Amino acid sequence: MKLVLASNNRGKLAELQSMFSPLGVELVRQADLGVGEADEPFHTFVENALAKARFAAEHTGLPALADDAGLCVDAFGGQPGVQTAYYATRFGYEKGDANNVRALLEQMRGVASRRAAMVSTLVAVRSPDDPEPLIAVGRVVGEIATEPRGDGGFGFDPVMFIPEFGKTFAELPVEVKNAHSHRGRSAQQMLALMRERWF
């Protein structure tokens, strides 16, 4: 089954493709089908993911899978949340993973509580007007490290310290990270939902 991924993020594609391949699902980025990015005007992960999935399905004619994910820092009232990808731009930096990490570490300087959660909300639709979208949420709680560690992953992985492993996501082998990450958890839920309702 071909499923359009409502994202142009190559990191998300690689991570999700490895998780969905056992189901016989081939993920294709919407950009590879000539489709641009959907607007993300909402304040919650689920609303943005649903908007992206419907947009991709409408413009490709294929079932669609969308992920809206982000970092929610307790000391910042859950921010940056849905604005995670643009976090660095709030502090005068260009958009990008390295700048996001840099800005976060600068803002966390002197902050005692380093507790944070990575959240991934996956939404799948069979068509743009699917009345019963599949929704899966994965969440991992950890702490923001004081400096980047590790070379793997993307986004905030180098500073998302997971106490149960004693490492950041970027220090974990990819198969361990994928099994225990926020996206890994939401993907496992989504796979179960797809098996139950679509296959």
UniProtKB/Swiss-Prot annotation:
Binding residue positions for substrate: 7-12, 69, 154-157, 177, 182-183
Q: Does the keyword Transcription apply?
A: no
Q: Which reaction does it catalyse?
A: XTP + H2O = XMP + diphosphate + H(+); dITP + H2O = dIMP + diphosphate + H(+); ITP + H2O = IMP + diphosphate + H(+)
The protein's matches in InterPro entries, at most eight in alphabetical order, are given as: dITP/XTP_pyrophosphatase, ITPase-like_fam, RdgB/HAM1
What cofactor does this chain's UniProt record say it requires?
Mg(2+)
Q: Output a single Gene Ontology CC term carried by this record.
A: cytosol
Which BP terms from GO are recorded?
nucleotide metabolic process; purine nucleoside triphosphate catabolic process
State the superkingdom.
Bacteria
What does the cofactor field's note say? Binds 1 Mg(2+) ion per subunit.
Q: How does it assemble?
A: Homodimer.
Q: What is this protein called?
A: dITP/XTP pyrophosphatase
